């Protein structure tokens, strides 16, 4: 994943093995992966579809966090063009004890989640694009 590069669904079907950002020692973070283009950029009626949500990550140790939504790779419908898949990292003001992610995968609003948990603005982000493989 490198700032908008195009990847195939096959390349991203498995959970990433390396996710990194400039983390403060002892700080807790939230990581979310979302598709703002569901089911398509022209008609994003399911905006946003979240593909991954982890809270209470200690530093950059993603495996130390609490998984609220397991990773799902890109799976865009045929004929819907390129979708953006956005990774955002938020520094938490403290541990999050509410383990409800606030909705189903479609129509998830990362900003609403961030506001609910007082996360402020993202401290890191990246994205890739993918489209249906024929």
UniProtKB/Swiss-Prot annotation:
Short name of any one Pfam family annotated for the protein: PBP
UniProt xrefs under InterPro entries: PEBP, PEBP-like_sf, PEBP_euk, Phosphatidylethanolamine-bd_CS
Gene3D superfamilies attached to this UniProt entry: PEBP-like
CDD domains to which the protein is assigned, alphabetical: PEBP_euk
Similarity section: Belongs to the phosphatidylethanolamine-binding protein family.
Listed name of the protein: Protein D3
Recorded name of the encoding gene: D3
């Amino acid at each position: 994943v490198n700032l908008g590069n195009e990847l195939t669904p096959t390349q991203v079907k498995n959970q990433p093995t390396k996710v990194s950002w400039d983390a403060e020692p002892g700080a807790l973070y939230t990581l979310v992966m979302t598709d703002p283009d569901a089911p398509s950029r022209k008609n994003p009626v399911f905006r946003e579809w979240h593909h991954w949500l982890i809270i209470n990550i200690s530093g950059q140790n993603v495996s130390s966090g609490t998984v609220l939504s397991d990773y799902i790779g890109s799976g865009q419908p045929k004929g819907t063009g390129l979708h953006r898949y956005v990774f955002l990292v938020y520094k938490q003001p403290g541990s999050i004890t509410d383990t409800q992610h606030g909705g189903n995968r479609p129509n998830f609003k990362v900003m609403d989640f961030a506001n609910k948990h007082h996360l402020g603005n993202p401290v890191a982000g990246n994205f890739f694009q993918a489209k249906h493989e024929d």
